[in-house]
Amino acid sequence: MFRTRLISGIVIVLLTLGLMMKGGIVLAAALCVISLIAMYEFYRATGVTTQEPKKINAFEVVGLIGVVVYYAILVSPVNELYLLLTLITLLITLMFVYVFTFPKYHARQLMAAFYGIVYAPVLMSFIYLTRMLPHGEYIVWLIFISSWMNDTCAYCVGVLIGKHKLAPKLSPHKSVEGSIGGVVGAAIVAGLFAFFLVEKVMQEQAIVPVFVL
């Protein structure tokens, strides 16, 4: 088990490193695929996906097509306002599906279908947007470093001094102390990363507090 996790972890790190260095349409395509998988799993977990085998419903079709269109616009040389218009169009389309097929779908499926688009694909696209910023090849690592250090610090602090449960029913092993330790640890490491690496590249002192936040 440990060996499998170690190997998979190394592979993921190498792939992440390669994609972040490459950037551009290759990174966007990879994020699009990951987003589609994540959204599909979210749809399954929230009941958007139909229970009938080998069948997909209209909400899934709108979501899948919408994500591909969203990423196509993301990499195209158009105003980023079109990304917002795409999301609004997807919401209206989902509402049309709900109204004209009523009562086939529940309102909660409609809400989950739209939230699934925002939760995975849209948030994932910020990796691409960050990477495409000036000096983005350095800045983008703050996303991963902050996430990794938050998990690591939260685990270590929770194991050492965690006594108060954060959400006993949802996640019984997480503690208040661990969650605070994760946030503080991630902020400190992100600040150090910005100060010692990104700061040297960009030569803008004001950038450090922005990155920490």
Question: What would you call each of these model-derived segments?
Answer:
Residues 2-212:
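Membrane-embedded alpha-helical bundles of polytopic integral membrane proteins
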